Amino acid sequence: MGIARILSAVLFLSVLFVVTFPALLSADHHDGRIDTCRLPSDRGRCKASFERWYFNGRTCAKFIYGGCGGNGNKFPTQEACMKRCAKA
């Protein structure tokens, strides 16, 4: 019975690898990290009012950032946003 459990575990892990590996190679990942330019704008959980720029899929647009939290799709300037996210 011990060998049957080992074979079952190997089979399970093999199937898990085959199912999840393509997601790691998808277009949303670069160098093992999620492409921040595809994330939605996120004002964060705080109540401050800072002007920031985010990439909306076509260009960089302004949004109001609350000062904490949020995600990586926030840039201090339009130039910084375009440099990181615009495709040549």
Curated annotation (Swiss-Prot):
Expressed by the venom gland. It is found in: Secreted. Residues 1-27 form the signal peptide. The record marks 47-48 as: Reactive bond for trypsin. The keyword Cell division does not apply. Residues 28-33 form a propeptide. The keyword Aminoacyl-tRNA synthetase does not apply. Keywords: Disulfide bond, Protease inhibitor, Secreted, Serine protease inhibitor, Signal. SMART domains: KU. One of its GO terms (biological process) is envenomation resulting in negative regulation of voltage-gated potassium channel activity in another organism. One of its GO terms (molecular function) is serine-type endopeptidase inhibitor activity. Disulfide bonds join 37-85, 46-68, 60-81. Gene3D superfamilies: Pancreatic trypsin inhibitor Kunitz domain. Belongs to the venom Kunitz-type family. 02 (native) subfamily. Serine protease inhibitor that inhibits trypsin (Ki=5.54 uM) at a molar ratio of 1:1. This is Kunitz-type kappaPI-theraphotoxin-Hs1a. It comes from Cyriopagopus schmidti.
